[in-house]
From Swiss-Prot:
One of its GO terms (cellular component) is plasma membrane. Pfam families: ATP-synt_B (PF00430). The keyword Cell wall biogenesis/degradation does not apply. The lineage of its organism: Bacteria, Pseudomonadati, Bacteroidota, Flavobacteriia, Flavobacteriales. InterPro entries: ATP_synth_b/b'su_bac/chlpt, ATP_synth_F0_bsu_bac, ATP_synthase_B_chain. One of its GO terms (molecular function) is proton-transporting ATP synthase activity, rotational mechanism. F(1)F(0) ATP synthase produces ATP from ADP in the presence of a proton or sodium gradient. F-type ATPases consist of two structural domains, F(1) containing the extramembraneous catalytic core and F(0) containing the membrane proton channel, linked together by a central stalk and a peripheral stalk. During catalysis, ATP synthesis in the catalytic domain of F(1) is coupled via a rotary mechanism of the central stalk subunits to proton translocation. It is found in: Cell membrane. NCBIfam families: ATP_synt_b. This is ATP synthase subunit b. Keywords: ATP synthesis, Cell membrane, CF(0), Hydrogen ion transport, Ion transport, Membrane, Transmembrane, Transmembrane helix, Transport. The gene is atpF.
Length: 224
């Protein structure tokens, strides 16, 4: 069915009237709303772009911060290790110095104690050697005295026998024998004097021998 001309006419009139009404009352607000919406969309897109750039910048900053923090971390760790090594070295040096000082002190104390002990031992040895040498020399002197007394008694007996013979001859044979035997008497006196001088020399020799042995032992002790 084809529409009639009247219907088309009235429909077009209604459309025009509605278009005029809409354009006059509704078109501008709709356009404004659309413009606002478009502007909002454009602004939101721009803001999104800005946000993207801002996020990129933040990411870059984050990366830089992380890099810097890594560098700082390694730097701090290295510094901490260096300080630790320095502290350990200083502590080792201090410990070495303290141990060296303690060792030196102990060595000095040991040496002093050793010297004191050696001096005591030397003095004891010296005293013992003096006592022993005195005993030995006393024994030697006693032996020498015994030998000398024996020798002296023997010689006295010989001299007495000889003088007794001279005495008998002097009074038996007269004045001639007296003059002749006076020389023998002088000989006997000389022999007696020689004997006593010999005995003195023996005592002197023993005395010097004692001194020599004593000082020799003393030198040996001082050498040790």
């Amino acid at each position: 069915m084809t529409p009639s001309l009247g219907l088309i006419f009235w429909q077009s009139v209604i459309f025009l009237i509605s278009f005029i009404i809409l354009s006059k009352f509704a078109w501008n607000p709709i356009n404004k709303l659309l413009e606002k919406r478009e502007k909002y969309i454009i602004d939101s897109i721009n803001n999104a772009e800005k946000a993207k750039e801002y996020l990129k910048n933040i990411k870059l900053k984050k990366k830089n911060i992380l890099k810097n923090t890594e560098k700082m971390k390694y730097f701090i760790i290295n510094e901490a290790f260096k300080k630790k090594e320095q502290i350990e070295k200083e502590a080792k040096k201090k410990a070495k110095l303290e141990s060296y000082l303690i060792i030196n002190k102990t060595q000095l104390l040991i040496e002093n104690k050793k010297k004191i002990a050696i001096e005591k031992i030397k003095n004891e040895i010296l005293n013992m050697s003096i006592i022993i040498s005195e005993k030995i020399l006393n024994k030697e002197l006693e032996i020498n005295e015994k030998n000398n007394n024996y020798f002296f008694n023997k010689k006295l007996l010989i001299i007495m026998k000889f003088s007794y013979k001279i005495f008998i001859k002097r009074y038996a044979k007269g004045f001639f024998f007296l003059v002749f035997n006076s020389k023998k008497e002088i000989f006997i006196k000389n022999e007696i004097e020689k004997f006593f001088s010999y005995k003195k020399e023996l005592y002197k020799k023993n005395y010097f021998k004692f001194k020599y042995t004593f000082f020799k032992k003393k030198r040996k002790d001082n050498f040790f």
